[in-house]
Structure formats: C-alpha cells, structure tokens
Amino acid sequence: MDNKISPEAQVAELELDAVIGFNGHVPTGLKCHPDQEHLIFPLGCTILIQAINTQEQNFLQGHGNNVSCLAISRSGRYIASGQVTFMGFKADIILWDYKKRELLARLSLHKGKIEALAFSPNDLYLVSLGGPDDGSVVVWSIAKRDAICGSPAAGLNVGNATNVIFSRCRDEMFVTAGNGTIRVWELDLPNRKIWPTECQTGQMKRIVMSIGMADDDSFFYLGTTTGDILKMNPRTKLLTDAGPAKDKFSLGVSAIRCLKMGGLLVGSGAGLLVFCKSPSYKPIKKIQSQGGITSITLRGEGHQFFVGTEESHIYRVSFTDFKETLIATCHFEAVEDIVFPFGTAELFATCAKKDIRVWHTSSNSAHRIGVTAIATTSDCKRVISGGGEGEVRVWQIGCQTQKLEEALKEHKSSVSCIRVKKNNEECVTASTDGTCIIWDLVRLRRNQMILANTLFQCVCYHPEEFQIITSGTDRKIAYWEVFDGTVIRELEGSLSGSINGMDITQEGVHFVTGGNDHLVKVWDYNEGEVTHVGVGHSGNITRIRISPGNQYIVSVSADGAILRWKYPYTS
C-alpha cells in the first residue's frame, strides 16, 4: 500500500506570512470593503484583504493564474474574482465568503479570460463578461451558485464589451459597454433570458474604458479612450450629453465614480484625478498622481476615497481638501534581486530595473534610493561586481576612496550570481556561459572552474565551505567539490522551467529554491528531498533569500510581487 503514495504526498505546505505588492493593471482592481475598514486588491493569483488601520493581511488563494477582475457585493458578504487562463481553456470565477475568508463556489463557463464582474444590488445575481475569445455575458444565481442564462455580449458588427455595471436599485437591469457597443440588459427570470437594448449615440463612435452608475439609476456615465465622458439615460437609452468639448482627458478616462452629492470623480490614463460635473465636465478640483489611474474606490459615501495606479501606487484622498496621501507603493515591474544586511533579519533590500527599495521586514514599508546591484565582503572593505559582459571586478572601498583593484576576465557571458566566502579570501561567481569560477581574492586569480551544460542562475556556498550548490536553466541542482571542481550529486530541482534563485541556511541543513514553475521549495541538504512547497507566486520567481536567524523566507517574482513566508523549522 505504502509504495503507491507519491513522494509529493509527504510535502508540507509553506505558510505565507505577508505579501508586498499590488497589481495596478487590473481595471477597478482596488476596492474598499463596505465595512470601511479593509482594502481588497489582487496580486498575481492571490487576492489580498488588508486592514486599512493595522495593515493586517488575509489571503484568498484558489486561482491557478492571474486575477483579471474583482467585485464586492453591496452588503459586503461576497467577493467575486475572475482570472486569465490559456486560450481555449475555461477561466474560473470564484465566489468567496468575506467573513469566513473562504471559497464558496467555482463558476466555470467562460473561456480564456474573465473581463469584468458585477453584483446585483441585493446580492441575488452576479453578472460576468468573458474576454475577447469568449465574447459572452452570463448571469449567475448566487443562492444556487449556478448560471441562469447567457448571451453574446455585443452585436456582430461591433467590438468586444469590456465593462459591466449593475443597476443600483433593481436586480433585473445591468449595462455592458466596450468597443462601439453600449447595451442595457433586462433579466427575464421566468423565461431564463436576458434581453439587450442597444443605446444610440448618433454619429459618435467611442471605445468605452470605464463605467459609473448614479445612485438613483437616473443616468450612467461612460469614460472613453478619446478622453471624454458620455452621459446616458438607461430608460430612454439615449445620449443626454457628452464632454468636455475641449481639453479632453489625456490617454482616456480610465476610471469613473459617481458621488451621492452629485458630480463625478474621474481618473485618466495620464494619472490625473479630477472632480467634475455634468454637462461641462470641466475640472473643479484636480490632483496629479504617478501612473495611469485604474481604480477609484469610495470609503463610505465618498468623504474619503482610494486611488490605485498602474505604477502600483495606492493613494488616500480626502474629498474636502482634495489632498492625496501615498499609503502604499511597491515594484510595478520584475524584481531582480533581494539582499539581507549582515546578521539582521529586520531589513531587506530589493531592486528592479528603475528602483531600489529598502523594506522593514515586520511592517513591509519602503523608501526609495538610487539604482545598482553588488556583492560585498563581510568586513565591508571590498565590493565584488559582475557585469553583462562577463567581467568580475574587485573594488577597494575606503571612507573617501573607491579603487578598482582588479578586473577578472574569464566569463564569456553575463555574471548571474556572486557569493563570498566567510573569511573574505575567496568568492564564487556563476555565469550564463555555463561556468562557475572560484576566485582567490588574495592573489586575485582563478582557483577552480566548474563546467556544465546549463546557463547558471544561482550558486551558494555550504556553510562549511567545502561544497557549493548550483542551479540554472537545466532544472538540476548540482553539488560540487570546491577543492577540485568535481560534481558530487545532481537533483531534479523542478519539473518545468529554470531555477532562478537559491539560498541556504546558516547551519547548512536546509536550502530553498524558486524559479519558473512559480513554486518556493524547501529542501533537506543531506537527503536531497523537498520538505515544503509554497504556492502563491503567479510570475517567475527571480530571487529567494532566507533571513539571518531563519525566521522568514522572502521571494520575489517577475510580476513585481514580494512574498514573505514563515520559515518551517525552528532554528
């Protein structure tokens, strides 16, 4: 009986401790919960529920790929989220219970991508819009967790519908809009049908980016790629007015929100946040933010609201003085590296293409400084740097002076990883030319070269420093003898994709790896077996580190996410 159990069965799950990041590219992805205490937003395939005051986090995990849209019911009881998947495959919608933080139902009908979701005002129905390959609109019963009916979202001679919004008063009416199409739908429950009526805009042809409904259902407003706003009447299905006539919003109206007191909050693709009123739509108040605005979410009636941008900034704005406060910021592109300072687990630094950020581990907060990437000796007197051309440079650093001691030219391709021995007399560099070189830092020359048929991505010294472990694009983890460069053993590190990051504990008992399979794996060094697996990244993991003192594992990925995991063993 025992021999049938797969080795994967004994692998424990790694506990996710904290997430730093926000995917600002999801339209209306940032939501303030009706309890006014929590922000809800997607990051990769995870949905974060974060307390506004205490920053405490909960995670909703269940999607197999990136979350593409998010909706919260008006009562706050339910959250719905949709995902992207591969062409031809079914994309899931997941219905979550907010209070219990658990999955209620998985709704699968659409193919490829879920474009948008909306709840009816009394939590009776959920409407979903499929992506370009799917093109259908489906109404789901929340009580039965099943589809009521569906229909093609747009006519034959127009583009795709990309936005959906429910009526604020009636459970039977909703609006879809997109490229050249604006439709008001009526749900006919006894016959299980939805009936569309095309809205007339005359000569005006527009691509709709965002949509907002007035509280009394008197009008709905459409933000367009042209940079103007259309005001439509849902009863007559006619255009009431459009504007502004001049000075349209640059890069389109990407977010729109109706306020109870009258007027609109409008966000543009150029990062301009504006309060304006029909029919002129001229700015009454305005703020410039960093990155195109993708979400505006009200806290309560709108006395305070939150704004999310493409550059992963979250702002809090109070309506009365219209001043913004940056409350969260993180990398919006691939994170390239992580490093902990010597002997402290309190801080760590991450770098992306354009910025370096230093984070405080327990509070996950950051400040911005310059841009570079280096490896240092523990006495801080030398810096060893590797370049894209394969050169390894040793620099001597004094209080006022920086001197290049030696340029070591052996590698033929870029240096991907540098590790320094504890006594600062030796270092190892891994390169994508398929070599690892062990350098003598006293005589500044090569000690040993290791060759393999792979592009090396990472290397680690075992703490006793007579062995090194390497991994790279061939998915194998190799143990090597430092003295003569011979291979001791090879492990199959991943079933799919390169291993990009690796780190080893101070005792050398366990090590961690991460790569293109999006999994964080904890290994037993001597047994060569996986003991724990962490699922949470949806981009390729680029680097991984264990904090000094073995409290946390921090992993970063190509989608800009930083995940902090609880280290599974007590040191």
Swiss-Prot record:
InterPro entries xref list: Quinoprotein_ADH-like_sf (IPR011047), WD40/YVTN_repeat-like_dom_sf (IPR015943), WD40_repeat_CS (IPR019775), WD40_rpt (IPR001680), WD_repeat_EMAP (IPR050630)
Transmembrane intervals: none
WD repeats by residue range: 62-106, 109-150, 156-195, 288-327, 330-364, 366-405, 410-449, 451-490, 494-533, 536-571
Pfam families reported for this sequence: WD40 (PF00400)
Keyword Repeat in annotation: yes
A Gene Ontology cellular-component term: axonemal microtubule
Keywords: Cell projection, Cilium, Cytoplasm, Cytoskeleton, Flagellum, Repeat, WD repeat
Subcellular location: Cytoplasm; Cytoplasm, Cytoskeleton, Cilium axoneme; Cytoplasm, Cytoskeleton, Flagellum axoneme
GO BP of this protein: flagellated sperm motility
PANTHER family found in the cross-reference section: CILIA- AND FLAGELLA-ASSOCIATED PROTEIN 52, WD-40 REPEAT PROTEIN
Function summary: Microtubule inner protein (MIP) part of the dynein-decorated doublet microtubules (DMTs) in cilia axoneme. Important for proper ciliary and flagellar beating. May act in cooperation with CFAP45 and axonemal dynein subunit DNAH11. May play a role in cell growth and/or survival.
Subunit structure: Microtubule inner protein component of sperm flagellar doublet microtubules. Interacts with BRCA2. Interacts with the CCT chaperonin complex. Interacts with HSP70. Interacts with AK8. Interacts with CFAP45. Interacts with DNAI1. Interacts with IQDC.
Family stated for the protein in its record: Belongs to the CFAP52 family.
Protein name, entry field: Cilia- and flagella-associated protein 52
Organism: Macaca fascicularis (Crab-eating macaque)
Lineage: Eukaryota, Metazoa, Chordata, Craniata, Vertebrata
Gene of this entry: CFAP52
